[in-house]
């Protein structure tokens, strides 16, 4: 079986790109464990050295989506997450944004994992907050119905990644697989705000989201962060109506003060959970400001507001009214309550 992949590997070794069908077939085979570890490593290394194309990113994501365990639901959900890998060890921003978005009336399917390069990933901080990250699909659906937000633990929904995980660990550098988390939401989110770890990925990820069927999506990188940032300028690529629009955002443009990166530095899951709790209890400052900015983007992408300034106001209301805190409490309750299958 592994001999069948040699022509494809030869193309990659020569610096050629894979067409969409070949890329999807190969990555689907990787998720079934058919190529040898050496072949998988050779392929992803060659793609990394040449640079991932939009077609390859979308094809790999499409194969991963098809191998995933989905969450069925009737909603127009949004996801707010990043690729990770920015190495800045900030507080959990997109996690907090998920609850603010739910508090503002959106249905949020938050896709995430444990920390890989950071000290506290989404799954880690949610566990510290009392969320059962190993919730059943029935519990996830209950949370989405009642709290407006569910958490989709990547390891539980993407079991096929077990075939490539050891290879990724042994390589120890970023490959195309590191870009796929935000592109493979098991709830089929058509609206997304995706943070990327480097400026060069901003436009390709937006185009890949479009190729995968997104209705409206932002791909963002903020001065070194895989988030919209209040520390400087954020680069944005928006996918909407079949085209990508590139622009930049500053915090001042939406009425928020600029922050220092040191003001956003996080710690272990307990530290970050405590900061998130204080945020929802009314603490103001740089953490609140960056959460407001990112939540505003979510409201805009979901067509809940018409401008980022309106989105900031709605995000502030979601926190100050207690609705964001209630969304967190609802997720904790739903994931720790037995629900019949």
Swiss-Prot record:
GO terms for cellular component: cytosol. Keywords: Amino-acid biosynthesis, Aromatic amino acid biosynthesis, Glycosyltransferase, Magnesium, Metal-binding, Transferase, Tryptophan biosynthesis. Pathway: Amino-acid biosynthesis; L-tryptophan biosynthesis; L-tryptophan from chorismate: step 2/5. InterPro entries: Anthranilate_Pribosyl_Tfrase, Glycosyl_Trfase_fam3, Glycosyl_Trfase_fam3_N_dom, Glycosyl_Trfase_fam3_N_dom_sf, Nuc_phospho_transferase. Mg(2+) 1 binds at residues 94, 227. It comes from the Bacteria. Catalyzes the transfer of the phosphoribosyl group of 5-phosphorylribose-1-pyrophosphate (PRPP) to anthranilate to yield N-(5'-phosphoribosyl)-anthranilate (PRA). It is an enzyme of class 2 (transferase). This is Anthranilate phosphoribosyltransferase. Homodimer. Its cofactor is Mg(2+). Pfam families: Glycos_trans_3N, Glycos_transf_3. It catalyses: N-(5-phospho-beta-D-ribosyl)anthranilate + diphosphate = 5-phospho-alpha-D-ribose 1-diphosphate + anthranilate. Binds 2 magnesium ions per monomer. Belongs to the anthranilate phosphoribosyltransferase family. The gene is trpD. Anthranilate 2 binds at residue 168. Anthranilate 1 binds at residues 82, 113. 5-phospho-alpha-D-ribose 1-diphosphate binds at residues 82, 85-86, 90, 92-95, 110-118, 122. Its EC number is 2.4.2.18. GO terms for molecular function: anthranilate phosphoribosyltransferase activity; magnesium ion binding. Disulfide bonds: none annotated. One of its GO terms (biological process) is L-tryptophan biosynthetic process. Mg(2+) 2 binds at residues 226-227.
């Amino acid at each position: 079986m592994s001999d069948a992949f040699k022509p494809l590997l030869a193309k990659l070794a020569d610096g050629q790109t894979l067409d969409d069908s070949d890329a999807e077939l190969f990555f689907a085979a990787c998720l079934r464990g058919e190529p040898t570890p050496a072949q998988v490593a050779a392929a992803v290394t060659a793609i990394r050295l040449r640079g991932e194309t939009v077609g390859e990113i979308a094809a790999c994501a499409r194969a991963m989506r098809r191998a995933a365990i989905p969450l069925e639901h009737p909603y127009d959900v949004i996801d707010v997450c990043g690729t990770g890998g920015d190495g800045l060890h900030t507080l959990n921003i997109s996690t907090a944004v998920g609850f603010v978005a739910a508090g503002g009336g959106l249905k949020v399917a938050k896709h995430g994992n444990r920390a890989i390069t950071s000290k506290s990933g989404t799954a880690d901080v949610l566990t510290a907050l009392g969320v059962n990250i190993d919730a059943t699909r029935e519990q996830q659906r209950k949370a989405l119905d009642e709290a407006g937000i569910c958490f989709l633990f990547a390891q539980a929904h993407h079991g096929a990644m077990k075939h490539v995980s050891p290879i990724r660990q042994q390589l120890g550098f970023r490959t195309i697989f590191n870009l796929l988390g935000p592109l493979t939401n098991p709830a089929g989110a058509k609206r997304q705000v995706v943070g990327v770890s480097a400026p060069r990925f901003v436009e390709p990820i937006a185009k890949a989201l479009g190729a995968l069927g997104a209705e409206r999506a932002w791909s963002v990188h903020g001065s070194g962060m895989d988030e919209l940032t209040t520390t400087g300028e954020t680069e944005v690529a928006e996918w909407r109506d079949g085209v990508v629009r590139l622009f930049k955002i500053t915090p001042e443009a939406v009425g928020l003060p600029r922050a220092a990166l040191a003001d956003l530095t996080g710690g272990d899951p307990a530290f970050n959970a405590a900061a998130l709790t204080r945020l929802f209890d009314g603490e103001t400052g740089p953490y609140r400001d960056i959460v407001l900015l990112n939540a505003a983007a979510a409201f805009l992408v979901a067509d809940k507001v018409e401008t980022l300034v309106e989105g900031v106001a709605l995000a502030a209301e979601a926190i100050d009214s207690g609705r964001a805190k209630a969304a967190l409490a609802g997720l904790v309750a739903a994931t720790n309550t037995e629900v019949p299958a």
